[in-house]
């Protein structure tokens, strides 16, 4: 498989992604035996639960140093020294030092990750991500696709990797009048190796969907579970949220946050649009600006 590249906003350059668990993922998704076993093992909530139990235990502390050594982990931003974390999951779900993610103006990224844009899409249009193709109708599943003016959507897919900060936040001031809608599913990896070989991740993995109301209209946040992520934890309470308020976190594994708005409600930053048009993800940090609201845009 070719190396995975993305544009790193902070570094101002295209970089090659370091993939944690590369060998195991290649076995699972690129060999006949692995593809035969994945429905029993690699898509199993039981296996995810067992991994979660291990990574919650003190025995897993030795794995922290390996993760911290991967380029891009930025372990120095953690609120505590590495040695103070009692388990791998405690480090994986770490909070950051105050000021580590200053809030930009406009609408900000809800998570650290690699962002790809799919603009002016309809509910049935497949939106690819490193070989994966899924439509919004399939992602929303039994809940049904929410109606929007002209039936067109802008979609920002933010793919987290193990090196990333795994708490996610509200991208703007908003209200959440309805509870989170959960869709159970398997636990597939959202690593690019897995996405190329198994393109149904965003419709088959567990999803938790939250409808939000902001000054520019309604939008949706979809949290997607992945292989090794036994739990998506929602930490927010109440119905009124400030920009940057914590919404929740993922336990061990890479995963994804999808931000969905009516087409044209936001004007995404030019660099994100440009690199997306070239098929390249952009690495963004939680709290940095990704878009601004558009005056006169249709509200939901």
Identify what each model region corresponds to:
Residues 1-300:
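Contiguous, well-folded functional domains in the mature portion of proteins
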